[in-house]
A protein has these predicted regions:
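Juxtamembrane helix-boundary/capping and inter-helix hinge elements in multi-pass membrane proteins
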Residues: 38-42, 63-70, 157-165, 188-192
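Hydrophobic residues within alpha-helical transmembrane segments
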Residues: 11, 15, 50-57, 74, ...
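Structural signature of hydrophobic alpha-helical transmembrane segments
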Residues: 5-6, 36-53, 97-107, 136-146, ...
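Selective hydrophobic functional segments
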Residues: 47-96, 179-223
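Signature of the 12-TM Major Facilitator Superfamily
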Residues: 43-50, 101, 168, 172, ...
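Transmembrane helix exit motif
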Residues: 56-67, 88, 102-127, 214-215, ...
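Selected transmembrane alpha-helices and immediately adjacent juxtamembrane segments
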Residues: 1-38, 120-170, 177
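Hydrophobic alpha-helical transmembrane segments in multi-pass integral membrane proteins
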Residues: 44, 86-90, 141-147, 181-184, ...
Length: 246
């Protein structure tokens, strides 16, 4: 990896970490999209694993709701593992541009519905079967694109998690997704020692960006957080859709 590429990679992870610190997600979406400019998809995904894993574990542990979200989200996370491993054959770039386009459009539609105050609601009794289904679909999309967002994020928001619960639940879900993706990449021998130092450097700058973002989030009211959460999803969706059209 040349010095120019490394500087670009580190800048990407600062921005991605900052976004994640504010709204609780966005690191893989932003990183995979921008790193694809200079790196092959499997190499970009391999470089993402360490920063994604550590920042998500940190986010998962940062709060007092871990036990409750673990109890509530185990069906979703079980489905994520099954979907990711089942979709391993698609890792090289699923669905081509149309996969990214469809994912982006779905994300924008969800964000717009949230901004319009259309509240999705999942009955508690339905979580037992809808959680695994949402997890399997999320896992398949993760294997295809390296992005962990759809439909796990709408599902977690629809079961009524509050601001801090939602951010911690996102950390849990993304930790599971990252580990499942890591197993898939290891099976395809995508990890090389050449990526070790760049990955460590990416981790450091991602954490710095995330800390800055968390400081901003701490100052947001629940209403402001909801607004920025959906605006962030809208921007990520537009970015993915634009990527799919190029």
């Amino acid at each position: 990896m040349t010095a120019t590429v490394l500087v670009f990679v580190l800048a990407v992870f600062v921005v991605a970490g900052f976004t994640k610190g504010i709204i609780g997600l966005g690191l893989p979406t932003i990183s995979m999209g921008l790193l694809a400019v200079v790196l092959p998809p499997t190499e970009a995904a391999a470089l993402l694993i360490l920063p994604s894993l550590i920042t998500n574990v940190w986010q998962m542990l940062d709060g007092g709701h871990l036990r409750s979200v673990l109890r509530r989200l185990w069906p979703l996370n079980l489905g994520v593992c099954a979907g990711t491993w089942g979709g391993a054959a698609f890792l090289s770039g699923l669905g081509g541009p149309y996969g990214a386009l469809a994912l982006g459009v779905a994300l924008m539609a969800y964000a717009l519905s949230g901004l319009a105050a259309l509240k999705l609601a999942v009955p508690r009794a339905a979580e037992v079967w809808l959680g695994p289904l949402a997890g399997v679909v999320t896992g398949a999309i993760t294997a295809a694109t390296g992005v962990f967002v759809i439909p796990a994020v709408p599902y977690m928001q629809a079961i009524g998690l509050q601001k801090d619960e939602l951010v911690q639940a996102l950390g849990l879900s993304f930790t599971v997704s990252t580990l499942a993706l890591a197993v898939t990449l290891a099976g395809g021998r995508a990890f090389t020692w050449d990526l070790a130092w760049p990955s460590l450097a990416a981790l450091v700058v991602a954490i710095l960006g995330m800390r800055l973002g968390q400081a901003v989030r701490a100052r947001l009211s629940p209403q402001a957080f909801r607004l920025w959460f959906f605006l962030g999803l809208l921007a990520l969706g537009a970015y993915l859709a634009a990527r799919g059209l190029v």
